[in-house]
Amino acid sequence: AWSADGGETWTGWRIVDILPDGPQDRSYGCFAGLVRLPIAGRDILLYSNCDSPAGRKRGTVWVSFDGGKTWPLKRLVWKDPFQYSSLSAGRPGTASEGWIYMHFEGRLPQTRVARFNLSWLMDGEPTGDGAVPKIGSR
């Protein structure tokens, strides 16, 4: 989707059924995280949210290798209570380069930060929504 007015209106949007927005039995979302990885020549997006029909738990990251058209891979990051996540990618040329950070609420009042990389995500579970490309030495 694209917005030319700061998010007031959107064009080209669509619902992506493979990506949950919070508990699947509710009509409200759970503030998912989304980030584009700063990798030259690639359009890799990551999405984080809970992946459980039984409520706010199973914090999972989904991976898209084609700018969000498909989401062929996911990996569980946190199995316990999980909500309100945000994602950020390390900056090139700094000590954080190559790292992905996920900040989220666990069991209240706890907040947590998970740190992982794309290689770790590549060992995730196929979703059936598109193909997983070979990255690096894979």
Feature map (PLM): residue ranges:
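Asp-box/BNR beta-propeller blade signature and adjacent active/binding-site loops
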Residues: 1-138
